[in-house]
């Protein structure tokens, strides 16, 4: 287990985070400022699956959201290696950031955000089109992803709003992994799934490594971490406390 953080950027890193800080103002408690991330350094490489572990409130989801720019960091650097070269995400304009999302990197949150009266097939196919597929290719890729995640075809054109939590989570994961980008951020992607569908989802995520897709994922499920992760990063109080191989690190923090 290593407790050191990278100081210089690794040249072949898909994602390189340095000195990342983020705080939140709690307006309901006298405007108190609460730190969430304290100088986080992290690299993720091509085909590497990195699991973020740690207690609730440690800053794991905040880190993903700062990388994806759902949250704007207070300070620090988030660099993504794109097809055109490295790009600093913290200073990128909104239009360019929107262009990179999906094509260069993706984010699967815990909850599906789908337009009203839109079915799973169209939701997943829309992501495929944003990633460069034509309409027919996108629908074919969407169908393959939904099949792999065991979503019954009778639900493919049903309004996503009436699906169960587990069904919505599978649609969300299918959309994230269709024609996958070079980096995928996952926030508790299997938390609502029953055992059979959980295994199908984990197998799909695991297969991304063979496609060279880097994954940075938040998991509370230690079995999922053992199955998927090539490296575990343990986050505590907004800092990276330690990191290492799954068997070694999980034994150390048990």
Segments from the language model and where they lie:
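Helix-to-loop junction immediately C-terminal to a conserved catalytic motif
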Residues: 68
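ABC ATPase NBD coupling module
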Residues: 86-106
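Q-loop/switch helix immediately C-terminal to the Walker
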Residues: 118-129
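Conserved ABC ATPase "signature" region
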Residues: 137-154
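Conserved ABC ATPase signature
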Residues: 159-163, 167
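ABC ATPase C-loop
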Residues: 176-177
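Catalytic Walker B motif of ABC-type/P-loop ATPase nucleotide-binding domains
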Residues: 184-187
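H-loop/switch region of ABC-family ATPase nucleotide-binding domains
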Residues: 219-220
